[in-house]
Each structure stands twice: as C-alpha cells, then as structure tokens.
Amino acid sequence: MDERRMKGLMGLCVRAGQAVFGEDGCRRSVAGGQCGLLLLDGDISENSRKRYEELCERTGTRTVLLSPGLLEEATGKPGAAMAVKEGSLSEQMISCL
C-alpha cells in the first residue's frame, strides 16, 4: 500500500465531505450500502475489528486495516474507523492498495 498517497486521499475525503467517522456513523453507512470502503486503524481493538469485518462481509464492503495511528495522522480526527462514501475517491483508495 502506498501510505503517502493513501494519506493524501484520506485528507481529501474529509475535506470533500466523503468521510464518515464514529462507530454509529460508520455502521449506518456500511449497513445502508453507502460505504465504498471502510478504513480501520491498526490500533482498533480486536472485538471492534471483528464486528466491523462481519458487517462488511454481510454487505460486501471492502475493509482495510491501516498502520497504527495512520487514520488520525491523515485526517486529524481520533478514531478507530472511517467510512468512505461510494464514489471515485473510494475507488482511487482501493486502487492504491
């Protein structure tokens, strides 16, 4: 994974309003079929990671486990998960994996 490019795209998603943060928001986005990619920080707890992965498996949403701390470093927002709305930005992020 090209971390430098991924960080840039993550920041762009936030500025463009294409990112959803928080457990409830991410779960709603994935369950509602609005999420093109779910990014999980490497510091996420094992139980939370499993819950997100099970939900994404049921809905067919791609999940990526990032390096610890990368999510906050790239977006400036603390948290364990970021849902990227479906569209060209999520497709670009998938292409750099």
Predicted ranges, named:
Residues 2-37:
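N-terminal first-folded block
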Residues 21, 66, 84-85:
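A conserved hydrophobic position in a structured secondary element of the catalytic/binding core
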Residues 24, 28-29, 42, 47-73:
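Positively charged, polar, low-complexity stretches
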Residues 70-97:
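C-terminal structural segments of small proteins and small subunits
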